[in-house]
Amino acid sequence: MMQNNRNYFIAIALSVLIVLAWQFFYMNPRLEAQRQAEQAAKLQQQSQQAQTTQAPAAGAGAAVNGSLPAGGQTAPTVLTRDQSVAKTSSSRVVIDTPALAGSINLEGARLDDLRLKTYHETVDKSSPIITLFSPADTKDGYFTELGYVGSDATGAVPGPSTMWTLSSGDKLTDKTPVTLSYTNDKGITFSRTISVDDRYMFTITDKIANSGQAPVSLSSYGRVTRYNKPETPSAYVLHEGFIGVIGDDGLIETKYAATEKEATTPAKSTGGWLGMTDKYWAATMVPPQSTAYDARFSHFSDGTPRYQADYKQDAVTVAPSQSIELKNLVFAGAKEVPVIDRYETSYSIPRFDRLIDWGWFYFITKPMFKLMDFFFRYFGNFGVAILCTTIVVKALFFPLASKQYASMANMKRMQPKMEELKAKFGDDRMALQQATMQLYKEEKINPIA
């Protein structure tokens, strides 16, 4: 017994030493490096903002000659969200659903003003509701945008500076979609219908009609752009940054800092989704699932530092007097498990549930969560839910535990006979081992159990 206790305390001491060594030699240097990197990035950001405060806004031009238009640099002045929205109120379409409030900027048809009605900044219900998206000329600009890349033959196609016209609807709700339109000088008409459900999924359907005399080819693009990193403290136990499920590359999770060194460019793919995720919220885009596209996670340091997840699809051709239709999805909201699971099923979005970081043991953590969530919804109390989950898990493992306890009882019952064998064979370890194994066999005891 004393020997067993000594081994037990040695094991505890070694475990503590391993944890302390890991903290001292691995975590502390890593935390210090992160602190220095954040401090350097902050100084660089302050320097860049000081240099560009008098510069005009850039990156607002339309897409031309096959290039993806720039995401926009810093604005001449930094406004609050309310100031920016008020400045462009005449060219905005209001969004009002049970879960969302905000507006769409007709310039670029950009979704850059979005708040979550049912979530607050603190547990105090009187605190401000969460702001997810903000215009580019605010301190923490964050938005999504869909556009096109054309050529000289297509003329000017929708891009960041395109001024769309509201052709039907006056407010975007979960029951009333809106339609925007734009016609260029080559006779190509773009009609964009935007709808949203009662939670967080936007459906953007573009109809492109060619009334010209020659076929035209153009590529659609989509992007999620974010100015500066979120100010919330990062956590090592979950991923915050770029995320996507892209073709054969599968689930891709890239930290913001990683793209500051080199952009992440997965292989050309068909199907999937991409965007950015925070601890509780996310913004992702789901391109048309039947057309190949090139995806990219990148960082731009010109002007205000910004991060961008974007894709550009292979070109499609619209014949004269013909039209085509493209449908994109945009998720922008809270990472609610039932909602995300429903979207994965109803929209056939591959592995969309991985938008939530379930950790390495996804096959264990998600079922455990669903079980606990079921009990919470039934009883309305997390303490009771945890207790019920513990009982269920214990019940599932009861047969295994029962065998273990039975084996331990048998081993205890055999202890006197074991002592007799030790006294009989003394230092003859080989004979003692053979006699012990024979005893286990006769008594039908499995010591491993």
Predicted feature residues:
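Membrane-protein biogenesis/insertion across secretory and organellar systems
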Residues: 1-395
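Membrane-interface amphipathic helices and adjacent TM-edge segments
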Residues: 24, 43, 188, 321, ...
